[in-house]
């Protein structure tokens, strides 16, 4: 991976590692925020009822995969794990479509779109081929 790829991985992965660690250490506020979305998801997916446990597990995934991406360890796998954890995080954490107040709605929409951009970056990393491998993306991780 070139210097820009390493720097990008460090910045992208590092932010997930920091926020994930915070979720593992103190899940209460995030669990409360995620509660309504988790109840909706439970209608179609059998999830444990312990919202704090789910927040901690998600935080652990983000911590581990974020740290791995930050140091360049298994970047494609790490990026896929982060992408998989970011989708429910974004849905639960930034439901701008449910907010009446225009200022709060705009702020949550901004955070939702920021997460969507991060998801895009993760998908670019995940889709990057190994040096010499054909991936169809035109992007090489090596």
Each PLM stretch: what is its role?
Residues 1-142:
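Short amphipathic, positively biased membrane-proximal segments
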């Amino acid at each position: 991976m070139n210097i820009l790829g390493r720097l990008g991985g460090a910045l992208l992965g590092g932010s997930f590692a920091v926020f994930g660690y915070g979720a593992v250490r103190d899940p209460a506020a995030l669990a409360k925020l995620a509660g309504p979305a988790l109840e909706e998801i439970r209608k179609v997916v059998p999830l444990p009822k312990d919202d704090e446990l789910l927040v901690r597990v998600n935080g652990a995934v983000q911590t581990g995969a974020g740290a791995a991406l930050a140091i360049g360890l298994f970047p494609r796998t790490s990026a896929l794990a982060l992408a998989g954890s970011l989708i429910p995080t974004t849905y639960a954490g930034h439901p701008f479509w449910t907010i009446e107040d225009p200022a709060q709605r705009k702020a949550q929409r901004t955070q939702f779109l920021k997460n969507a951009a991060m998801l895009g970056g993760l998908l670019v990393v995940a889709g990057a081929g190994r040096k010499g491998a054909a991936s169809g993306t035109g992007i090489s991780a090596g």
